[in-house]
Design a protein with these regions (language model features):
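Pre-Walker A adenine-sensing motif
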Residues: 1-16
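Hydrophobic anchor at the beta1->P-loop junction of P-loop NTPases
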Residues: 23
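Conserved lysine of the Walker
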Residues: 31
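Hydrophobic positions on the alpha1 helix immediately C-terminal to the Walker A/P-loop
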Residues: 34, 38
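Short glycine-rich substrate-engagement loop in P-loop NTPases that contacts/grips substrate
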Residues: 53-85
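Conserved P-loop NTPase "ATPase switch" module shared by AAA+ and STAND
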Residues: 81-100
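Structural recognition of the conserved hydrophobic beta-strand(s) that form the central parallel beta-sheet
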Residues: 90, 115-121, 143, 152
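Interdomain motor-coupling "hinge/lid" segment immediately C-terminal to the ATP-binding subdomain
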Residues: 129-180
Length: 180
């Protein structure tokens, strides 16, 4: 399923040194789907965690360890180097851990070449509540909206109809009763 946001994900990937990427959006708008598709298509290796299912990682980030110590333990838990160019680290449901959200600043400053992307339901609500811990300026945020009509037609492989709608719109003419 093609989504317009995919091009933004490609632009983020093409930057040699980039901030962690956070996808914001309402529940069930396709955040996990599009991130999974992007990760599978664009990276050789994907390390994916869902914080709703990884209480061990949530607890790790609630400790008083230094950021370096937490990161080293995270790599051990996941059995992955995480910093290789061909690896992307996908954290789903990141809203579960406000401390891990705050730790994104560490990833940005200390591991700028690391490919890290995160998403979560109700993330925007959670961010508004905890602005003091959010790493302002250290995370790139992109909004994902529910599928629009153009994306819907593309998903249904209705490219001819889409082109005709655009043609009618640009010429300011009616489509006709049969197609409307």
């Amino acid at each position: 399923m093609k989504r317009k946001i995919y091009n933004d994900l490609i632009k983020w990937k093409e930057q040699t040194s980039h901030k962690p990427l956070m996808i914001l959006g309402v529940r069930q708008c396709g955040k996990t789907y599009i991130i999974n598709e992007f990760c599978q298509n664009e990276y050789k290796n994907v390390v994916q965690i869902n914080l709703l299912q990884r209480d061990d990682i949530v607890k790790l980030y609630e400790t008083d360890l230094t950021s370096d110590e937490k990161f080293n333990r995270l790599k051990l838990i996941l059995n992955s180097e995480l910093e290789a160019e061909d690896i992307i680290f996908f954290i789903d449901e990141i809203q579960v851990s406000e401390r891990l959200i705050a730790e994104l600043k560490y990833f940005c400053e200390c591991h700028p070449k690391m490919n890290i992307i995160c998403a979560g339901s109700l993330l925007g609500v959670k961010l508004n509540r905890s602005r003091s811990t959010f790493p302002v300026g250290k995370v790139k945020m992109i909004n994902l909206y529910p599928m629009d009509f153009e994306e819907f037609l593309i998903a249904l492989d209705q490219n001819m109809l889409l082109d005709y709608i655009k043609e009618c719109y640009n010429a300011n003419k009616q489509m006709g009763e049969v197609l409307h």
